[in-house]
Amino acid sequence: MNIQELGFQQTPLGELTLRRRVETLLGGREVFEVKLGDEYLMSSLFTESERQLATLGLGGLARELDVVIGGLGLGYTAVEALKNRNVNRLLVIDLFQAVIDWHQAGLVPNGEVLTGDARCELRQGDFFSLARTGFDTSDRTRKFDAVLL
């Protein structure tokens, strides 16, 4: 198995890495992984729960939506949210600036989709701290129709 490290950042929580590998047992499928130390945070092999979070979380809402997502990862929840025509604005908050940088640099498959959609804003921050004070630091009065975590 050939593993290529695409990104690395030392964080207070450990080493954060973005890896790409080709899985020969799956017909040469390209797999992207985000790891923190020895733990897998995200893999492009298993994305159904991330997609369903957006599909089910937004499915019953039938108006223009302002949505916030906690955690960017490989971007599957955010991309699925943007498929919903009612999503007017999407704010995605991730603890690690490196994860946002990887998307902005096009190192992950969903990076160009998210950075190319004017409805989507990627922002670094502590989602849980911001939940207490307001997710949008530039507009603390901003209200969200859905919070996906």
Predicted feature residues:
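A generic short-segment signal for beta-strand/edge and adjacent turn/coil regions
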Residues: 1-5, 35-39, 61, 88-93
